[in-house]
Amino acid sequence: MLRTANFLGVVIATGVLFFPQDTGKSIRPQKHAPHVSIPKISPRAEDVSTLDGMVKAYYEVVSGPADQPRQWDRDATLYIPNVRFIIIREDTAGKTTAQSMTHQEFVDSSDASLRGKAFYEHEIHRITHRAGNVAHLLSTSEHTSSSTGPVEGRSVDSLELFWDGTRWWITNVSIWDVESSRHPLPAEFLS
């Protein structure tokens, strides 16, 4: 998200599909996207009880065929109420910028970008640092436009989480960056 760098490169995670260069297949964020109503639901225990569950849900909520609405209600259960999404991207002139969004802004932009498009994102590698109730994850993902199609892009998302004694919460999707020919992913993010 959006939210891996892919989704999130797409958005995303994630993470509103942001790509450094437009290949003609990328999905760009919508500046004036319509507001998406997000119903309040209870979190799924399997999503929030482990770091693996959190990451699995993080990518699943943005993935699906073109005719399937994204799971924004499930997505909202993963985050603290005031979570921020900070997306790193490079414009066509090569200038790198950071864009900060609320969850609602992320959803509005992502939903508009993903509507009517098949998008599948999943984790391929993770670096985890944990100290007590705090965890920092660097999650590498790849995305495709079909569940069995060729990889179209990869990205790295930086997720900060905390354990409240009963469940994990994502407090910040601090950065994600999408791989490009100018910025290939380093080996440590792939194996």
Regions found by a protein language model. Name each.
Residues 2-21:
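Sec-dependent N-terminal signal peptides
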Residues 22-33, 136, 154-184:
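Short beta-strand edge/turn micro-motifs at domain boundaries
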Residues 22-78, 189-191:
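Short, low-complexity N-terminal intrinsically disordered segments enriched in polar/charged residues
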Residues 58, 75, 83, 137, ...:
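Hydrophobic pocket/interface hotspot
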Residues 62, 79, 87, 141-143, ...:
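Short beta-strand segments enriched in hydrophobic/aromatic residues
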Residues 72-84, 88-95:
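Acidic helix-start/capping segments at beta-turn-to-alpha-helix junctions
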Residues 78-80, 132, 156:
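Extracytoplasmic
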Residues 84-85, 93-150:
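Surface-exposed, charged secondary-structure patches
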